[in-house]
Amino acid sequence: MEISWGRAMWRNFLGQSPDWYKLALLVFLIINPLTFFTNSFVAGWLLVAEFIFTLAMALKCYPLLPGGLLAIEAVVIGMTSAAHVREEVAANLEVLLLLMFMVAGIYFMKQLLLFIFTRLLLSIRSKMVLSLAFCVAAAFLSAFLDALTVVAVVISVAVGFYGIYHRVASSRGEENDMLDDSHIDQHYKTVLEQFRGFLRSLMMHAGVGTALGGVMTMVGEPQNLIIAKAAGWHFGDFFLRMSPVTVPVLVCGLLTCMLVEKMRWFGYGETLPEKVRNVLQQFDDQSRKQRTRQDKIKLIVQAIIGVWLVTALALHLAEVGLIGLSVIILATALTGVTDEHAIGKAFTESLPFTALLTVFFSIVAVIIDQHLFAPIIQFVLQASEHAQLTLFYLFNGLLSSISDNVFVGTIYINEAKAAMENGAISLKQFELLAVAINTGTNLPSVATPNGQAAFLFLLTSALAPLIRLSYGRMVWMALPYTIILTLVGLLCVEFTLAPVNEWMTQAGWLATLS
């Protein structure tokens, strides 16, 4: 018997999301207009809380859908205007171009990145050194590339290696289902569990590495570019101004990586089983023998394009998104990718998040129009200049650990810039606050997958169920990093940021403030 029209519509609404989630969103959509016409300030904060809820529940439904419905309703009832949303999008066009073109550009360099991580995995036998190598490699790559892409590459390596061993363990060849362990002997299952633990720890080290490297440069994370644009900084300026905080944090993050591996704390310390290593080594040897001269040329070309990418970013030869577009053109033209559909696949990773970011800007427009953050900013600005840095760092860190750091960073940098333009703070103080905001959004946000887009991407990937990486386990494994990164970042903002920036200005490394 066919279901009723109403039931069919209910099932279609937000698809496979739980019924309670669908009901919650409908309640939000009903109460928002009623609240807005009663008290617009309360309604604005209600909308922000609801939007953060959709980000926190990203595993139930991709936030673009519920967040988009809330944003559309906000425009319709007059919480903001379509014109203001367009202004916010136009002001942040560079960030959208970064996500569209840079992520797609790096997609065409995946062969080189896969080659690098495969070499690391098979050539380093010490688990501590290997973990450190993955963390450092992810940090370095994330300083110049998008963190999502770096994590996507490491996921590709892990899924590939897991699949190779799982096929051998199940003896089912190409028909093997990686989610099905029923055909695997108990002995192989024990080895497989150890392999899962090994991959979990490597993925977490790589994920944290993207945060350690991503905070250091203006292209490492989308919000970095928003903050850099607001402060008028180029690539070199951004790196130098962040370094009093980011360099000590990087060192302490790497020491944490070594410590948790050595002590086998928080689920770390599993080594690569020798039986698995032998299987993977045989497969890699076979792959290398089958690599043609054409394949080798592709790797060389991708390496040269990588050098161009780093050089162009460091010298600020063009806007970040346009440099990404140049990578797409060079990588496709010189490696023979000419089919439209093959090129189109490169954009599938970035466009949903680009659309979600556009929805963020709609919520930001509401925050500006309804003056939602005015009381918080006034409270912070009443403190001494030194205390302002700590408060901005802590407020950003708290919100970023439960919400998306792009959203939080955008809100706070806009408010800080408005305070400077209104004469509430000096240009010098604004630039220090920009560092506090950037580090506050990037470092404590490793606490949960909600805060870091790369972590959320890992949690929702095909790899997570294979290696038994749940939300709770991810939070637990991130805990030592969360504590160390947050505390070291806070101490650096408190004690080293202002004096080191002053010293660099006097040394002529930074432009003298007018």
Swiss-Prot record:
UniProt keyword annotations, A-Z: Antiport, Cell inner membrane, Cell membrane, Ion transport, Membrane, Sodium, Sodium transport, Transmembrane, Transmembrane helix, Transport
Topology relative to the membrane: Multi-pass membrane protein
InterPro entries found in the cross-reference section: Na+/H+_antiporter_NhaB
Pfam families: NhaB
GO terms for cellular component: plasma membrane
Transmembrane segments: 23-43, 52-72, 97-117, 120-140, 144-164, 202-222, 238-258, 303-323, 357-377, 391-411, 447-467, 475-495
Gene Ontology MF term list: sodium:proton antiporter activity
UniProt-annotated location(s): Cell inner membrane
Family: Belongs to the NhaB Na(+)/H(+) (TC 2.A.34) antiporter family.
Stated name of the protein: Na(+)/H(+) antiporter NhaB
Species of provenance: Salmonella arizonae (strain ATCC BAA-731 / CDC346-86 / RSK2980)
Protein's gene: nhaB
